[in-house]
């Protein structure tokens, strides 16, 4: 299962960002090109194993856009994107967030109180972005049916679980200067 994703992750190039080994992958970075077969495999898996009884799919720019698009096209469920730009539309939700890698503001439009959503993201490391996003959505009165993240790296899933936020990952990885390794399925996050 998810063989295209796993194979592509194992082949992902590693670059250094300071002391941090960073993997580059089409699903998490948009480069090199995103293979439609990869998106097809991922979206099929998400549709099969997620609670799809939702009003909306919600994902985070930029790399959440192709994921949400693929799922939306297959299910007919509309999607909204959490943006880094403010639009000042009525009902816009502003989130101030700080993670291990960045800080700033995010904006959600097209989500209303009482909506039931599927939240999809490309990668989780520290869990910071999802933590702030989930809190903002819950305060708005939105129900989150599932939180699905394609690639799990680091301890973000465990940190969020300790706060009562359940995140499902498709693949958990370890990244070193030698490359990406796929961690065995523990059943805890998948």
Curated annotation (Swiss-Prot):
One GO BP annotation of this record: IMP salvage
InterPro entries: HGPRTase-like, PRibTrfase_dom, PRTase-like, Pur/Pyrimidine_PRTase
Main EC class the enzyme belongs to: transferase
PROSITE patterns given in the database record: PUR_PYR_PR_TRANSFER
Subcellular locations according to the entry: Cytoplasm
Keywords tagged on the record: Cytoplasm, Glycosyltransferase, Purine salvage, Transferase
One Pfam family cited in the UniProt record for this chain: Pribosyltran
GO terms of molecular function: guanine phosphoribosyltransferase activity; hypoxanthine phosphoribosyltransferase activity
Record field: catalytic activity: IMP + diphosphate = hypoxanthine + 5-phospho-alpha-D-ribose 1-diphosphate; GMP + diphosphate = guanine + 5-phospho-alpha-D-ribose 1-diphosphate
EC number: 2.4.2.8
Pathway as given in its UniProt record: Purine metabolism; IMP biosynthesis via salvage pathway; IMP from hypoxanthine: step 1/1
GO cellular component assignments: cytoplasm
The protein's role, per its UniProt record: Catalyzes a salvage reaction resulting in the formation of IMP that is energically less costly than de novo synthesis.
Subunit note: Homodimer.
Cited HAMAP family: Hypx_phosphoribosyltr
Family membership: Belongs to the purine/pyrimidine phosphoribosyltransferase family. Archaeal HPRT subfamily.
Annotated protein name in UniProt: Hypoxanthine/guanine phosphoribosyltransferase
Species name: Methanohalophilus mahii (strain ATCC 35705 / DSM 5219 / SLP)
Protein encoded by which gene: hpt
């Amino acid at each position: 299962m998810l063989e295209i994703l796993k194979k592509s992750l194992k082949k992902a190039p590693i670059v250094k960002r300071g002391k941090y080994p960073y993997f580059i992958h089409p699903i998490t970075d948009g480069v090199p090109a995103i293979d439609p077969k990869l998106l097809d495999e991922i979206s099929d898996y998400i549709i099969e194993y997620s609670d799809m009884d939702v009003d909306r799919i919600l994902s985070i720019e930029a790399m959440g856009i192709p994921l949400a698009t693929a799922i939306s096209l297959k299910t007919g469920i509309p999607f909204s994107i959490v943006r880094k730009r403010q639009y000042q539309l009525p009902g816009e939700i502003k989130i101030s967030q700080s993670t291990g890698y960045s800080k700033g503001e995010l904006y959600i439009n097209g989500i209303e109180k009482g909506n039931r959503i599927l939240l999809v993201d490309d990668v989780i490391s520290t869990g910071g972005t999802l933590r702030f996003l989930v809190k903002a959505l819950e305060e708005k009165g939105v129900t989150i049916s599932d939180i699905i993240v394609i690639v799990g790296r680091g301890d973000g899933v465990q940190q969020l679980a300790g706060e009562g936020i359940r995140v499902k990952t498709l693949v958990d990885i370890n990244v070193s200067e030698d490359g990406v390794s796929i961690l065995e399925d523990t059943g805890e996050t998948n």
